[in-house]
């Protein structure tokens, strides 16, 4: 097996879809016993908890209109057909990260209209 150079490795990562990158991170976590979560520094608790300005949209359930959900996922993310289909069939799939709350609520409404269930975290 030939060794990849750093440049080749980075180029291969750039070509991966979001789902493939997610699988890669999980495999690295499992293989090396590490976590991709950023270390948290202990700080003083804020005086008042603010509502998050950016959220992550996760698909809980695609519902009966799976074709419509796949089309909506493609529209939102720009994923290819197979990646969008895989995301629609996988419960807990991250549809989009770091979305402004207003935009996330609009996207959630579109999924609700299709009979799908999404979670904003």
UniProtKB/Swiss-Prot annotation:
Keywords, comma-separated and alphabetical: Ribonucleoprotein, Ribosomal protein
SUPFAM superfamilies hit by this protein: ClpS-like, Ribosomal protein L7/12, oligomerisation (N-terminal) domain
GO CC terms, sorted: cytosolic large ribosomal subunit
GO biological process, one term: translation
Superkingdom of origin: Bacteria
Functional summary from the UniProt entry: Forms part of the ribosomal stalk which helps the ribosome interact with GTP-bound translation factors. Is thus essential for accurate translation.
HAMAP family assigned to the protein according to its UniProt record, in alphabetical order: Ribosomal_bL12
Protein name (database record): Large ribosomal subunit protein bL12
Lineage: Bacteria, Bacillati, Mycoplasmatota, Mycoplasmoidales, Mycoplasmoidaceae
Gene: rplL
């Amino acid at each position: 097996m030939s060794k990849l150079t750093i440049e080749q490795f980075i180029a291969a990562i750039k070509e991966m879809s979001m789902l493939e990158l997610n699988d890669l991170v999980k495999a690295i976590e499992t293989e090396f016993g590490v976590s991709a979560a950023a270390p948290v520094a202990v700080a003083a608790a804020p005086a008042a908890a603010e509502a998050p300005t950016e959220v992550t949209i996760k698909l809980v359930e695609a519902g009966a209109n799976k074709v419509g959900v796949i089309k909506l996922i493609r529209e939102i993310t720009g994923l290819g057909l197979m990646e969008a289909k895989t995301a629609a069939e996988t419960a807990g799939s991250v549809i989009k990260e770091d979305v402004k709350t207003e935009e996330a609520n609009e996207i959630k409404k579109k999924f609700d209209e299709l009979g799908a269930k999404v979670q904003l975290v």
